[in-house]
Amino acid sequence: MQVSSLNEVKIYSLSCGKSLPEWLSDRKKRALQKKDVDVRRRIELIQDFEMPTVCTTIKVSKDGQYILATGTYKPRVRCYDTYQLSLKFERCLDSEVVTFEILSDDYSKIVFLHNDRYIEFHSQSGFYYKTRIPKFGRDFSYHYPSCDLYFVGASSEVYRLNLEQGRYLNPLQTDAAENNVCDINTVHGLFATGTIEGRVECWDPRVRKRVGVLDCALNSVTADSEINSLPTISALKFNGALSMAVGTSTGQVLLYDLRSDKPLLVKDHQYGLPIKSVHFQDSLDLVLSADSRIVKMWNKDSGKIFTSLEPEHDLNDVCLYPSSGMILTANESPKMGIYYIPVLGPAPRWCSFLDNLTEELEENPESTVYDDYKFVTKKDLENLGLTHLIGSPFLRAYMHGFFMDIRLYHKVKLMVNPFAYEEYRKDKIRQKIEETRAQRVQLKKLPKVNKELALKLIEEEEEKQKSTLKKKVKSLPNILTDDRFKVMFENPDFQVDEDSEEFRLLNPLVSRISEKRKKQLRLLEQQEQLKNEEEEEPEGKPSDAESSESSDDEKDWVEEVRKQRRLLQQEERVKRQEQLKEDQQTVLKPQFYEIKAGEEFRSFKESATKQKLMNKTLEDRLKLEAKHGTLSVSDTTVGSKQLTFTLKRSEQQKKQQEAEKLHRQERKKLRRSASHLRSRPRRGRPFH
């Protein structure tokens, strides 16, 4: 057993426990249960609740007594009696089952849809009848009032098979190329089918006419969803008379009210996997939606996640046991999953003891019985010299190797290599020495802000300590230990923005200066070494070489700066193009603002000035108006006050008119008359 908790909701996995190897005999299994406490405490809720390889579908009968599951290989169906907690019967089939439906309250009437177009009917005694449909089927539903089976599949038609008459009826012609899923509302009998184009078509079985179409593909696309292909309908489920849940192939679940063509809620699984099944839990108003990776339980009104269930293997089908907190899963593994969530509801009547056992479950996962065995390959047997044991009871063939007892493996390992302990001891000593060495050179904990700058300063400090010219190099205080620069490594406001334009343009210069400083330190060290060796003249580079080297460095730095500037210009162009595209896509709409009564709107620029003016007292505002000349207050002989104010607009017009008048006068003064210039008389005949 395993206990997990998500959002403070405990989930008990009843199928996760010690798994016994298949090649163990019954006698050894019983002996192992007596010896091993973990195996003895293992809870096997239903005996042999598994398939040989894979389980594809799982359902519960209406009376809740029988659990039916189909799987492979070979294709088969298994029926489990919950009252006996064991397997009731098993029937092998000719081909794999796509889906099946239990028509009766118990297991006496079952219909199977196979992947080779066959429809198989089973009764309580076994196989009853088999027929075929024209196209490959994917899903079917049973209409109880008319005894009709509706089959959908790789065709635009919905085939109808009447079980009372025993013959096919006229099919329903849909507008889709193919249909994936279908369902019938148990309240009013509405038939719905999900198409490959992402639409849901609803039909009235009484008149065999289409009564509505929902375009779910368009409604499933939200701002947060990333969809690369057209969503198709992969799951469909009715709840009551008016609610319907639709699952898409891109991982969205849409909740609809049949009276509206817009979804009430769109829930995204965020995995991009097709929704396998959808179920409703009415007591807590939850929706259980499952894809091949996870089962999510969320509130159908708000979409808030309640809890989730993520098994080890991929999911093929999910079944919610009615009126309880038990969930059954069909997985891509031999074991079928049984999960119990006490918050969803009580344990079923046939396993009411789970309520007491769940209080004693351990939260740590259990180890498997395979820990008592060691898996070895044929090459390992050759190295150990145990090839002669192949075929004996000491080795059990499994996949590409063998299982052998772990105690036997340790004994043989010790005999083959008696010095293994000494080698192990030496390896441990070497690891300890390496750990101590690593601790000596371990750097101090870097600050939260400007980590790269701090690491650079630490490296420079280490280089100074390693250099032999400690006396000649002037010792500078360390910035990391200086309190004046303490804020630079603590306050996020002082974080160096490496993406800024200033940093990218100055970074080549800073790196070039640091490289020059390192070269100078190396040259000084070489000169010191030469002096210590008492050489007459230290060899060095000629001045021409140094000048050429400095010029090359300068050229490299200039090229680096030009490169950074080109990159910045390119990024700026890309940003402008993106902004232009966004501006073209956005549609500008006029915005309206309500102006208070008694106020006059001039421009948005005066809003700040007006706000400051309103904050002042009445006396200050009167003084300000009198100063500008727009307001004058005088006393009358009667003792009252006379107030005169001038409109700003008329005042501005007067000023403008006076300015124009002065301008005309200046132009008139500067104008020179041309009346003194007269044209000379022309010679020759006048031109007529």
From Swiss-Prot:
Residues 528-561, 570-589, 644-688 are annotated as: Disordered. The modification Phosphothreonine is found at residue 481. The modification N-acetylmethionine is found at residue 1. Residues 423-476, 512-589, 640-673 form a coiled coil. Residues 546-557 have a biased composition (Acidic residues). One of its GO terms (biological process) is maturation of SSU-rRNA from tricistronic rRNA transcript (SSU-rRNA, 5.8S rRNA, LSU-rRNA). Keywords: Acetylation, Coiled coil, Nucleus, Phosphoprotein, Repeat, WD repeat. Belongs to the WD repeat NOL10/ENP2 family. This is Nucleolar protein 10. It comes from Rattus norvegicus.
